[in-house]
């Protein structure tokens, strides 16, 4: 497994122990208690999810002869907290079932929207505009989440309408207002989103980007946002959310999750943990890393690169950190930890062009489902499962935890696209 280590860049370029980073000043944090207090204040807000918890299960891995190599067994009620070390026998990893957070919203999408949705309601947004691919889990999540709150969603999907609506595309169509956009026009996402948002808003409406309604905004945005909140109810208030919700605000949902998991009766604060997560845009992995760093946790994030190059993942990582520090000026960056060890960007076991399914992968997903009751998909979560399985073969000191980001509905789209892979399934 090829490993590439990331570098977290503090915005100031300097760091000693813990620091607050601000555009105007840098206030040193002298103790771990200070950093935890900052995180507590950061998370003292309204949330979209009623509770940050999702089920934690334990997957035992056994070597077998033949082409399958491994068999799996699921313990749906494992020992956690101090009991984890006592029950660690043989090869096993834990799986955080974020795929069970919502029947139609991917787990990682629910986390990314966790902090945004209450702000949308507080500022009386009437319409939300975003974009994604034809089978975008993000647009489906936005459509469902908006409909649940009585808001209108406008979804710009890349390419042409498929002959048969299924999977995330069907969910987006049922819950939101879908427009298919030619690839040439979609290439300039910012202009495309702004133009369509202006059309939705009309002459009397107002348009804002998601970053305009978060803390740390400048004076001009404050005035604009106040006007946005006080508008007459008859006027459209349109909010633009970037593709994939890959903004700094999305990191807050991961902060909330990490704080929850670091409780003593779950993973704890002192136990070494190797997290494994599939990386589409990489936002979830960065959120896990920054949150673990801020809380001083001895965790390592293994991000399996699926859709981009190492250079671009690192660029996105640096952008998110800079944006997060700008929007939340008290952001904590713990240089007491070796940041090169916080996130490891790694290749999946069988690299390929994104979107391609290799022979035998659908069969492996079926095997895992039948043996454990956990459904993974060959596009995303199978890659994380394979990496977690590989890690536990050699890992002795750390606990391995896979974050199941979801993707169940994606299987419907894949079954339509790769018909022979599914029709040839046999016992």
From Swiss-Prot:
Lineage: Eukaryota, Viridiplantae, Streptophyta, Embryophyta, Tracheophyta
Gene Ontology BP terms: cysteine catabolic process
Subcellular location: Mitochondrion
Pfam family, one: PALP
Family classification: Belongs to the ACC deaminase/D-cysteine desulfhydrase family.
Record's GO cellular component terms: mitochondrion
Chain positions with N6-(pyridoxal phosphate)lysine modification: 109
Reactions accelerated catalytically: D-cysteine + H2O = hydrogen sulfide + pyruvate + NH4(+) + H(+)
Keyword Transit peptide in record: yes
Range annotated as the organelle transit peptide: 1-45
Cofactor dependency: pyridoxal 5'-phosphate
InterPro entries hit by this protein: ACCD_DCysDesulf, TrpB-like_PALP, TrpB-like_PALP_sf
GO molecular function: D-cysteine desulfhydrase activity; L-cysteine desulfhydrase activity
Organism: Arabidopsis thaliana
Keyword entries, A-Z: Lyase, Mitochondrion, Pyridoxal phosphate, Transit peptide
Class of the enzyme per the UniProt entry, highest EC level: lyase
Its biological purpose: Catalyzes the production of hydrogen sulfide (H2S) from cysteine. Can accept both D-cysteine and L-cysteine as substrate.
The organism's place on the tree of life at top rank: Eukaryota
EC number(s) from the headed UniProt entry: 4.4.1.15
Entry protein name: D-cysteine desulfhydrase 2, mitochondrial
């Amino acid at each position: 497994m090829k490993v590439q280590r990331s570098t977290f860049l503090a915005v100031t370029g300097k760091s000693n122990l813990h620091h607050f980073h601000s555009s105007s000043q840098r206030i040193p944090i002298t103790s771990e208690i200070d950093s935890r207090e900052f995180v507590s204040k950061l998370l003292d807000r309204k949330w979209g999810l009623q509770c940050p918890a999702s089920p934690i299960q334990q997957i035992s891995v056994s070597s077998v002869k033949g082409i399958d190599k491994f068999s799996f067994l699921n313990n749906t009620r494992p020992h956690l907290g101090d009991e984890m070390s006592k029950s660690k026998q043989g090869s096993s990893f834990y799986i955080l079932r974020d795929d069970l957070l919502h029947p139609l919203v991917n787990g990682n999408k629910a986390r990314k929207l966790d902090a945004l949705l209450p702000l949308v309601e507080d500022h009386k947004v009437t319409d939300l505009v975003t974009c994604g691919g034809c089978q975008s889990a993000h647009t489906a999540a936005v459509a469902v989440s908006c409909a649940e709150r009585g808001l209108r969603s406008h979804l710009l999907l890349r390419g042409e309408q498929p002959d048969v609506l299924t999977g995330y595309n069907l969910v987006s169509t049922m819950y939101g207002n879908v427009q298919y956009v030619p690839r040439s026009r979609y290439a300039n996402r910012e202009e495309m989103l702004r133009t369509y948002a202006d059309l939705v808003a009309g002459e009397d409406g107002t348009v804002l980007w998601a970053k305009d309604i978060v803390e740390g905004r400048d004076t001009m945005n404050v005035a604009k946002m106040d006007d946005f909140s006080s508008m007459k109810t008859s006027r459209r208030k349109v909010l633009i959310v970037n593709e994939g919700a890959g903004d700094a605000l999305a990191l807050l949902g991961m902060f909330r999750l990490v704080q929850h998991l670091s409780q003593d009766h779950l993973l704890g604060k002192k136990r070494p943990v190797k997290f494994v997560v599939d990386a589409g845009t990489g936002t979830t992995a960065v959120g896990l890393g920054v949150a673990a760093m801020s809380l001083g946790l001895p965790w390592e994030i293994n991000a399996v690169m699926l859709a981009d190059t190492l250079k671009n993942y690192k660029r996105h990582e640096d952008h998110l950190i800079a944006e997060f520090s700008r929007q939340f000026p008290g952001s904590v960056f713990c240089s007491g930890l070796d940041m090169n060890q916080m996130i490891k960007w790694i290749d999946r076991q069988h690299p390929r062009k994104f979107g391609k399914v290799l022979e035998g992968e659908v069969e492996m997903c079926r095997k895992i489902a039948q043996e454990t009751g956990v459904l993974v998909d060959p596009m995303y979560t199978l890659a994380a499962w394979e990496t977690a399985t590989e890690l536990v073969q050699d890992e002795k000191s750390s606990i391995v935890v896979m974050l199941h980001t979801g993707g169940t509905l994606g299987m419907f789209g894949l079954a339509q696209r790769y018909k022979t892979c599914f029709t040839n399934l046999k016992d």
